[in-house]
């Protein structure tokens, strides 16, 4: 169903409203004082009667301050007929009129620069073009409205988008925490709602390191929001890596645009390969924090830190901030299950070593997306280095009932094999 001129015309109706006739020089004061009383979309006729419409019914008394304004400025109350329609209505008002009673107007949409995207339900899909056009018309700052077609079924976490209204362009500039991020929403993973989570971890890293000598290994960096922000906020040094070549392109652009070339080093390779190259001294980066924001897969990469001391000779062990899913009815069960998954890669890990456990969101009643912060344990760091055979992400219990919003999900993942020297 598309929004046509006929549909717009069907929303028009004529109704009586109270109007006030006043001198031209009073109009600005009236508009400022009684903005909430003004009938939506009303216009005054400066050359004719200088009429300003107000949205008060005849049965209701006029507000006292409005009565005083009328008296003090010798205004006259008039009754007028006005034609109202699509242009006078809000997004919700239009869709309440046009959608069937069993279909709710979607309220949950994300704004990315001048792009708005929905995750429409099955009931809403027949009306997707109508919904998209109404949203575009009622939000003048938007240029593109789209819908994500399905869950993220590729290793790069990029969405499949359907244009609903506006320009077929997904380039965007997003301001966040003092940086400007350039991206193409169709080619890279982006979630605006992770802003506060990045803020939380940056503050926690500052607390752990007393705000000094912070060196972050950002293994799944996307277009670089975390690395750029912590570089700006805490003067941190960052090694920012992502497997997606498109992310790497925008990462480079964002580093230059935000003038952090001396603080953020970009990479485009598999996360394990990055760590192995550091061990082999092919990459010179002495990190003290590891940021692993890839919830479906990040825990599977923890085994690369087994034997850290053996491979690097360093006794100062890094802090690790890793994201993943867990199931449980309370925090204790969630932590226990999360910990058991970590132990598969780091056999010396114990849940008593957890420094901070944070729930980002509920996926289902029992399943949560979580972030766990801990310091690499001495036993794992000093044990013999060796990668662990990883569970198949497609058969994992954590993939069985995935109902997470599409922007936070990867189902089919590729665990790239890296040759160990």
From Swiss-Prot:
Enzyme Commission number(s) from the entry: 2.1.1.228
Catalytic activity: guanosine(37) in tRNA + S-adenosyl-L-methionine = N(1)-methylguanosine(37) in tRNA + S-adenosyl-L-homocysteine + H(+)
EC primary class: transferase
GO terms under cellular component: cytoplasm; mitochondrial matrix; nucleus
Pfam family, one: TYW2_N_2
Binding-site residues for S-adenosyl-L-methionine, renumbered to this chain: 198, 242-243, 270-271, 293
Superkingdom assignment: Eukaryota
Matching InterPro entries: MeTrfase_TRM5/TYW2 (IPR030382), SAM-dependent_MTases_sf (IPR029063), TRM5-TYW2-like_MTfase (IPR056743), TRM5/TYW2-like_N (IPR056744), tRNA_Gua_MeTrfase_euk (IPR025792)
An MF annotation (GO) of this entry: tRNA methyltransferase activity
Protein family: Belongs to the class I-like SAM-binding methyltransferase superfamily. TRM5/TYW2 family.
Protein purpose: Specifically methylates the N1 position of guanosine-37 in various cytoplasmic and mitochondrial tRNAs. Methylation is not dependent on the nature of the nucleoside 5' of the target nucleoside. This is the first step in the biosynthesis of wybutosine (yW), a modified base adjacent to the anticodon of tRNAs and required for accurate decoding.
Protein name: tRNA (guanine(37)-N(1))-methyltransferase
Source species: Paramecium tetraurelia
Phylogenetic placement of the source organism: Eukaryota, Sar, Alveolata, Ciliophora, Intramacronucleata
